[in-house]
Amino acid sequence: MEGSGDKRHENLDEDGYNWHAQSVESVSKALGTNPNLGVSDGRSAELLKQHGYNELKGQAGVNPWKILLRQVSNGLTAVLVVAMVVSFAVKDYAEAGVLVIVIAFNTIVGFVQEYRAEKTMDALRKMASPSAKVIRDGSHHRISSRDVVPGDLLTFEVGDVVPADCRLIEVLNLEVDEALLTGEAVPSLKTVQPIGGKDVSIGDRTNMSYSSTTVVKGRGKAIVVSTGMSTEIGKISKAINETKTQSTPMQRKLNLMAYMLLAFALLLALIVFAVNKFNFSTEVVIYAIALSIAIIPEGLIAVITIVQALGVRRMAKQHALVRKLVALESLQAVTNICSDKTGTLTEGKMVVTNVWLPGHESEYIVAGQGYETVGDLSTSAGVAVVRSAALEDVNYRLLVECCALCNTANIVEASEGKVWGDPTEIALQVFAYKMEMGMPILRKHKELVEEFPFSSDTKRMSMVCQTESGNFLEIFTKGSEVVLSICDNVMDRTGDIHSISGDEGFLKLVSTQQEEMAKQGLRVLVLAYGQVSERSIGKPLSKWERNDAEKSLTFLGLVGIRDTPRVESEQSVRNCHRAGITVHMLTGDHKATAMSIAKEVGIIEEPHGSEIANGNEIVPLSASVMTATEFDQLTDEQVDALVDLPLVIARCTPSTKVRMIDALHRRKKFVAMTGDGVNDAPSLKKADVGIAMGAGSDVAKTSSDIVLTDNNFATIVQAIGEGRRIFSNIKKFVLHLLSTNVGQVIVLLIGLAFKDRTGTSVFPLSPVQILFLNLVTGTPPAMALGIEPASSSVMQVPPHVKGLFTVELIMDIFIFGTFIGILALASWVLVIYPFGNSDLATLCNTTANLQECSTIFRARSTVQLSFTWMILFHAYNCRHLRASLLTAEGGGASRFFSNKVLVASVFIGALLPIPTIYIGTLNTEVFKQEGITWEWIIVIVSVFVFFLLSEFYKLLKRRFIKTPYNM
């Protein structure tokens, strides 16, 4: 029989074989295996050669060289490298040395930050089970999971991690936690019968078990159908590796700007040579270098890197770990969040929330979050119920006892997460603890003497208890609606028993209540109770069968269980809406559960209609809630024709999540995806911002841009607010630095007209002065702008999706730069002509000839000081680009000293140029300037005029620009 599957083996993976739809016999035949003996050792060796090891490919560790390459392969760094090479070529070692330091600093900071973030485990490899229990040639073996092959016969028990995708052939109360794949908090109860249909979601393929899922209950035997990259985990891994990382708008704009600056720098150098009739003397070459350097913002990369690094530290304190610096920019542009439900919007823990008892006017509502063993009772109308009073009701007390005793969960410290067992049973036990009737208390008076475990056939579980008196046995039963079929009676509050045999009205009442609770997204359990004696059964307890205990029971009530929303989720969603961000929930849960949670956290209110055109047919759809099957059946054209994309997609698959993100991208939306499971990994990488939960899988973390260490959806809102703050501050210091460059270019371009006796242009600013202004004077205030606190309206305006260089920012750069350049040039002209000797002398670009160059050197000092004080004042201008500096909003008045780093950088920056002007040799030999006296008046007047021009320009902006201010 082994040989019969050889040919079929070659194409099983590629054909997308529907293993869940096949009988055990068909699967065995297709794989050439014996469902009792497994494959032989020889056959397994052949299959290993054919299919390869059961491991995931393409998951190499951190590569420092690739990280380093990313740091130096951006446009701005390329510009700095070109400038450095030219400086070395003309033997201007001071300037070249400064540029080397700047490039090295930028590279080191970026490398260290990204290397730390990327230094994570090889998550996908380590998710695989380290060993597997396999049957080969009829013998049991424990082998490495990487040696498992298609056709192998595996056995599972509680605690095992499934090593490969398998078709189940035997199960005994087998439940598997598939939350990492499906997102469902409730373990999947496994079966062996074939499941028809091609489009059955993973969560509904109950006769399959998948690689990296965990057995939480029972035992099973299965045939391996897929290994390695052919497993569902492997497909996800492949999707992750194939997803290309796109650069952000700011990256693209900065790179474009850098190459434009490089081209412009070469053009300016050409202009210098042309104006000087292509005289390549040292004086002219140095002027060309000065003009080329003037247009390059040497400090920009350093400031961006440092500000982002500070932002990373700040976000880490807020429980958001940034793995990729580009996420800081991406966050501010987010327009849509696609969120997983389990563990993200919800606690990821099953909790009893509703209890319905016959004869009561309303349900009991049970408060409390997660596994906390405290929680108040109230009616559905919100009226508080005293616990002790509720327990006086015999019916309710027995229902609580049933929750505690018909249970195998173990709770040590629920508040610390020390719980073991099936999530549903944990929820029931925690509920009993809330009523101060947990199993440890009840076991003091009642002994568990027999268990009839849950099975897929009976869909119920029963426990038999011996009371202290020993006169009778108590039977506690829980399960699905089938429990009602073995109930002959119902109990009232006083404990009296009433028959319900043939009472169709009562059965309909219970059925209606079950449906209502299910519509709320609850998993509904039926609880029942009975009293018997061994004598009445007619045989000793040790020989009892299930039917001996589970008959003629008394119906106690219904318990509703669900994965409750986090306390902060509703407010977080509301904050997102206020910030212009739409929240979508993509979950593996059923539609009713998904809709209930979405309503509770505020994602949707009531489903509203939408339509799509499909030829001549109008197909009605819900614009709020759809299943993955409904969504996937639509073509891309039909999806794009929807007025609104669904806010909730239930029974969601990994491919559906990616398709949803693609649909949002086609609508020019900027998407963040949150999640914690393996099933979220492809979409986390596909999204513009992938946000993983710290308690989630390593796969999700590896695929993400940001990891939330507190698993708190509210942290996402804080992270987006922080991203907006950082991006706003980047715009502020980009304006500050680039307007300085524009001013310098204006001074040096017009300065070409000032020629000495030999006809050589004399620069108003020397290359060292320019570097001093750009790095020493301009960079500290720019960094201070980078740590400006967020404005109060940062999360009350729509996302900024236009990128860094908006029309307004470009206009501001050139207008403020023109103000600075013209006023600085005016200082140059005033010192030389009206108040100087009007003589530009000779060789004042290269020598320190004080006898002839004194006026030129004094004029340069005046220009440098005017530049210095104007760009320092301009830092305050940049705090708010529309409000007057005289107002608190604009950074003046009460806010003038709020940014202490800015105050210090401005004060120190104003004093730093003074030594370069008055210290001998340093001033004349290095900076090509000298001390001034009366020229200080020109400096002060220049700054005052710049203030007036800035205020007038802002006044015009406030009057004529009506778009929202989001900086």
Swiss-Prot record:
Cofactor entry: Mg(2+)
Pfam family, one: Hydrolase
Main location: membrane
Domain of life: Eukaryota
Binding residues for ATP: 342, 425, 478, 523, 587-589, 651, 657, 679
Record-linked InterPro entries: ATPase_P-typ_cation-transptr_C, ATPase_P-typ_cation-transptr_N, ATPase_P-typ_cyto_dom_N, ATPase_P-typ_P_site, ATPase_P-typ_TM_dom_sf, ATPase_P-typ_transduc_dom_A_sf, HAD-like_sf, HAD_sf
GO biological process entries: cellular hyperosmotic salinity response; intracellular calcium ion homeostasis; monoatomic ion transmembrane transport; potassium ion transport; sodium ion export across plasma membrane; sodium ion homeostasis; sodium ion transport
Induction of expression: Induced in presence of sodium ions and high pH, a combination of these conditions has a synergistic effect. It is unclear if potassium ions positively influence the expression level.
Extracellular side: 92, 276-283, 754-812, 922-931
Glycosylation sites: 279
Name the UniProt record assigns to this protein: Sodium/potassium exporting P-type ATPase 1
Species: Physcomitrium patens (Spreading-leaved earth moss)
